[in-house]
Swiss-Prot record:
UniProt lineage: Eukaryota, Metazoa, Chordata, Craniata, Vertebrata
Functional description taken from the UniProt entry: Binds with high affinity to muscular (alpha-1/CHRNA1) and neuronal (alpha-7/CHRNA7) nicotinic acetylcholine receptor (nAChR) and inhibits acetylcholine from binding to the receptor, thereby impairing neuromuscular and neuronal transmission.
UniProt similarity note: Belongs to the three-finger toxin family. Long-chain subfamily. Type II alpha-neurotoxin sub-subfamily.
Disulfide bond annotation, renumbered to this chain: 24-42, 35-63, 48-52, 67-78, 79-84
Cellular component aspect of the GO annotation: extracellular region
GO MF entries: acetylcholine receptor inhibitor activity; ion channel regulator activity; toxin activity
Signal peptide feature range: 1-21
Taxonomic source organism: Demansia vestigiata
Tissue: Expressed by the venom gland.
Organism superkingdom: Eukaryota
Keywords: Acetylcholine receptor inhibiting toxin, Disulfide bond, Ion channel impairing toxin, Neurotoxin, Postsynaptic neurotoxin, Secreted, Signal, Toxin
Compartments (UniProt record): Secreted
Entry protein name: Long neurotoxin LNTX-1
Amino acid sequence: MKTLLLTLVVVTIVCLDFGYARTCLKTPEVKSEPCPPGQEVCYTKAWCDRMCSFRGKVIELGCAATCPRQEPGKEITCCSTDDCNTHP
């Protein structure tokens, strides 16, 4: 009986991924990092500032609990797999 119980405990630990955290690309360095607990959405925000005609749109990449709200003048896209918010 103890052997069966021990086997079930080991199988449970192996099957459950206790330390999993979503990873998203984050700015300013544009590198993959684990998201804080509860933040399972990766997002990309893009917008023009006064330097847009010279250097292109400003890009912000990160994690969120939910997809950020649309804002005037900002393009926001969201996804929910690891590192899915690639730089446009």
